[in-house]
Amino acid sequence: MNQVNFLNLDKNILIITSGGDAPGMNASLISLIHRLMNNNFNVFIGIEGLLGLYNNLIEPIKDKRVFDVYFNEQGTVIKTSRFIKLDINDKKTQIIKDNLLSHNIQKIIILGGQGSMQAGLVLTKMGFEVFGILHTIDNDFSETQMCIGALSAASFNQKLLKCLNYTAKAHCAFNLVELMGRECSWLVNNSVGKLKPILMLTNQDNKYTVDEVIDLIKDKINSIKEYDPLIIVQELIYDQKWYELLVKTFEQKLHKSLRITILNYLQRGAPVSDFDLQLAKDSANVLVDFIVNQNDIKNTNNMYVVINKFDNKLEVIKFNK
């Protein structure tokens, strides 16, 4: 598309997807585009997240239906990226500011997780009005009950773990499966479903040595009548060398085969659940209504983020930490 500059700053708004992708980003994006354009906003998109803003990959949306076919699709049609931590004194951050202002953009909506929200907070300190909708499979925001994408990933993991359980049993073997979650154990705990793993290791537990894990499994084999031959581990606790030593020691002391499966990006590409599709649509509507009805929030050094409480009621709160 050709670059188009609109003069009305109050009606120009940009949307980016940022950081790790999460199922439901497309649904949020498309819902936002429709709701914003129905309210006479000039909508821009940033291609490839913050990296795209740095590279001035900013384009206007001319047809609100342009991405409709991707509504149910995982990933993000406008792409995303990892980028440096923004800092108002950093040259690259200043370039992002200059690029946004060159398009007469003052309002920004960020779809992403923890790091993306922190980046948005930096942009508010540079004079921009920034809003966010939480998308992360880690579900690691204490302010909200559910982040978009988390339930999709957990549901998909349940299916994958069930498959791995079948094949492990078929070979009288055990399977250690590493799941994502970063510093939050929500995804691990909600990926198990009805399975009964012989052991689960999260960052809420002690960090065990290989011999300690072997002893734990021995005790459980002797004390538990029913279990599934799965060891579920949260990421960023143990490294590859630890896993390799565990495999070797497992065979030596338990006389069983241990397989290592790291699900990694399979979780990010999970099919989008009906729950996340609806949450994405509802969050977009609530945020746009907030933007339309709040004309006194300019340059407050606060970012505004959509959250849902335990009664699933959506609201917009200040995010300033």
Swiss-Prot record:
Assigned GO CC terms: 6-phosphofructokinase complex
Pathway per the UniProt entry: Carbohydrate degradation; glycolysis; D-glyceraldehyde 3-phosphate and glycerone phosphate from D-glucose: step 3/4
Annotated binding of substrate, by residue: 136-138, 180-182, 235, 259, 265-268
Residues reported to bind ATP: 20, 82-83
Pfam families in alphabetical order: PFK
UniProt catalytic activity: beta-D-fructose 6-phosphate + ATP = beta-D-fructose 1,6-bisphosphate + ADP + H(+)
Cofactor list: Mg(2+)
EC assignment: 2.7.1.11
Enzyme class: transferase
Origin: domain of life: Bacteria
Keywords: ATP-binding, Cytoplasm, Glycolysis, Kinase, Magnesium, Metal-binding, Nucleotide-binding, Transferase
MF term (GO), any: AMP binding
Any one Gene Ontology BP term: fructose 6-phosphate metabolic process
Localization annotation: Cytoplasm
Active-site residues from the entry: 138
Main location group: cytoplasm
InterPro entries xref list: ATP_PFK, ATP_PFK_prok-type, Phosphofructokinase_dom, PKF_sf
PANTHER family linked: ATP-DEPENDENT 6-PHOSPHOFRUCTOKINASE, PHOSPHOFRUCTOKINASE
Subunit structure: Homotetramer.
Family as reported in the entry's similarity comment: Belongs to the phosphofructokinase type A (PFKA) family.
Function: Catalyzes the phosphorylation of D-fructose 6-phosphate to fructose 1,6-bisphosphate by ATP, the first committing step of glycolysis.
Protein's name in the database: Probable ATP-dependent 6-phosphofructokinase
Organism listed in the record: Ureaplasma parvum serovar 3 (strain ATCC 700970)
Gene that encodes the chain: pfkA
